[in-house]
Design a protein with these regions (language model features):
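Intrinsically disordered, low-complexity regulatory regions
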Residues: 2-6, 94, 111-114
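Amphipathic alpha-helical dimerization/coiled-coil segments
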Residues: 17-21, 101-114
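Basic, amphipathic "hinge/linker" alpha-helix immediately C-terminal to the N-terminal HTH DNA-binding motif
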Residues: 83-101
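N-terminal helix-turn-helix DNA-binding core of bacterial DNA-binding proteins
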Residues: 19-59
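N-terminal leader segment of winged-helix/HTH proteins
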Residues: 1-27
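Canonical helix-turn-helix DNA-binding module
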Residues: 46-88
């Protein structure tokens, strides 16, 4: 059962989670990068750069730049689609899954303080 949060509570939760991430040793991801990561993990594959760009309403180069940074951190991987070589598939990694697990834990722990 979920409990609706007021505006101040929602912002406090976001602030507290953000502070915990900054104080921790997690990768410093932008909101766009976290959104991409959540999309890859919460929605059924396959995920292409084209599809992610459409979903986030940004250009393909914007997605590519975000994925470049995330790939260096091993949070996602990319490979050519063998069925359609024009497409690049964006895939999950163990490190990306662990990042989101820790983020979910931070949200859960900080939501208890509201």
């Amino acid at each position: 059962m979920s409990i609706p949060l007021g505006t101040a509570q929602a912002l406090k939760l976001w602030h507290d989670v953000s502070l915990a991430q900054v104080h921790g040793h997690e990768a410093d991801l932008s909101v766009r990068q976290v959104t991409i990561l959540l999309t890859i993990y919460m929605e059924a594959p396959p995920h292409t750069i084209r599809e992610l760009a459409k979903k986030l309403k940004v250009s393909k180069p914007v997605i590519t730049r975000a994925l470049d940074s995330m790939g260096k951190l091993d949070l996602v991987s990319r490979r050519r689609d063998v069925a359609d070589r024009r497409n690049v598939l964006v895939q999950r990694t163990v490190k990306g899954a662990l990042y989101l697990d820790r983020l979910a834990d931070l949200i859960g722990m900080n939501s208890k303080n509201l």
